[in-house]
Amino acid sequence: LVFTEIRQKIFEIIIKYKKPIKAYEILDVFTEVTGKRAHPPTIYRAIDFLIENGFIHKLNSINSYVGCFHPKVHKECYFLICKICNIYQECCDKNLTENIFKSANKRDFIVSNTTLEIEGHCNDCIQK
């Protein structure tokens, strides 16, 4: 596990952003912070490394990335995503994950990855 300077910087950018961030936004912030222009494939390779090693998650529904605040503790979690402000919450529920795996097994299906994204509205946006 080699945590290169580029991987470290991209991880820091994602964690500090506090909201889901898209790859090209990461590229822009990386250039701004380091003063160096990276090419998109460099950013995507670092993102792939961070996902594969459990440091970040990809939110497919909004094509963005978020930090994992308990890396390597689990592989399956679900996300609550506000459709208005894009704030998210990472949640874990072992029973939910077990039920997904049981349901898949009954259908002769082997799950390799589970990311459940639930869209709705956060309390702050509801109150506005």
Q: For each of these PLM feature ranges, what is it?
A:
Residues I43-N53:
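Basic amphipathic alpha-helical segments that dock to polyanions
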Residues H57-I62, V66-K128:
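Non-DNA-binding regulatory cores of transcription-related proteins
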